């Protein structure tokens, strides 16, 4: 929590745990921090360790509803439905969560097409689906009439990409996690060229750090390797596009966030780059690029979220 508060992040969507008390405690800490966040009590009732498995669909739904209603007291920290992913949730639980979503008007977050074995597994579990994303759609948990974040999407095919575009699903690109787990590298430039919504994620603990600056660097580097070694029809990410992912791309999920524009909420991070020595005078653009590659939370001096000073 301390690292997140002192980082460049102003808003986040977070996976918690299956446990209601722990999830509410996390939400209390985030509420005190001044950040604007969504937090999900994770649902999973199969294909996971017993100590992290919800004992039944009915109990999972009761716990989820109790958590949602207990979270109504928070102003800056909101609940988001979080089925871990299809392999860890039975069909009846997924349908029940869809009903909860409709009843409480909640957004949804989960995982999608992170690796090939996962995609094949979902096809076995949901043989009527046309693709992984279509399985979520059939359960009523894939955007359209609600906001939805899907993490990774490393191997999303054309049909899945079209479904995400049609339903306004936001892709949470998690480059370091995808590298650490040998999942692959998502074709982010293609997503953007095709009009999909994409933001940047750190995916702790698949990733090693909460820094969105580091995530920008990893996104650029991974895209260059993908271009060189896998598919030169998909250009590497430019710095401008990586910066967009870290600001307006992810910020769109929260509303008008991520830019200095009329009508946008004032999320501002003030950084001091004086410790990053350089023998020449640099332009503002060069200084910003240098911050992304070299800075950490020690360079953060002040932070404002929706105009309120939080650091």
Model-derived features: positions:
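His/Asp/Glu-enriched, well-ordered alpha-helical/loop segment
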Residues: 134, 138-144, 189-277
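C-terminal cap of metal-dependent C-N hydrolases
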Residues: 265-311
